[in-house]
Each structure stands twice: as structure tokens, then as C-alpha cells.
Amino acid sequence: MARVKRAVNARKNHKKVLKLAKGYYGGKSKLFKTANESVIRALRNAYVGRRLKKRDYRRLWIARINAATRMNGLSYSRFMNGMKLAGVDINRKMLSEIAINDPKAFADLVELAKKHLNA
């Protein structure tokens, strides 16, 4: 069987990994083996982080909406139920923005939800 020489491919792979590891501390930016381990871990953490970010933002929006609705005399879950009954389809991100930037408009939304809960 013929001997496989991987000089070009190995050099290309090493350069790619070391480029990704640029800025890492010590041997993690200089030595291929440790750099490769660090890069694999970093890419995995970045992948997981992108998914966790979505959860974190949703929790933040809900906490903001809950705080604003309680200031207007209603709980978050009853507010969302009232909004659904009223046929208002505004997502949580926009509701939290309204709660922060326009409290008067948000108070009107809470009143609308209360009206549909009692009806």
C-alpha cells in the first residue's frame, strides 16, 4: 500500500485551527493539539450559547411584562390570557418594549385585557 503524505492538508488544517485560536492564552494559541481542543470547546460553547440566549431573552421579556402588569393590578398569566381573549397578538418582545418606553399605552393594554377577562 502506498504511503500517504499529508503535508499540504495537515499544514492547511493546522493553520485554520491556529487562526481560530488567535488571542488565546499561552500554548492554547501556539500548539496545535491544545489549540484544537480549545477551539472545539469554544465552538461548542458558542453553539450552545446561541440557543441559551433565546431562552434568556424570553425570560427577561416575561419578567418585565410581569412587573409592569403587577403595577397595573394584574398578574402576567391573567394579562396574557386577557390579551388572547381580546384577540391582540403582540409578541412578548414588543410588549416588554411598550412596558418600558410607553407605560401609558401599556396601561391601556392592561385595561383591555381586564375588560375581556371580566366579559
Curated annotation (Swiss-Prot):
The keyword Transmembrane does not apply. Belongs to the bacterial ribosomal protein bL20 family. One of its GO terms (cellular component) is ribonucleoprotein complex. This is Large ribosomal subunit protein bL20. The keyword rRNA-binding applies. One of its GO terms (molecular function) is rRNA binding. It comes from Clostridium perfringens (strain 13 / Type A). One of its GO terms (biological process) is translation. Binds directly to 23S ribosomal RNA and is necessary for the in vitro assembly process of the 50S ribosomal subunit. It is not involved in the protein synthesizing functions of that subunit. Keywords: Ribonucleoprotein, Ribosomal protein, RNA-binding, rRNA-binding.
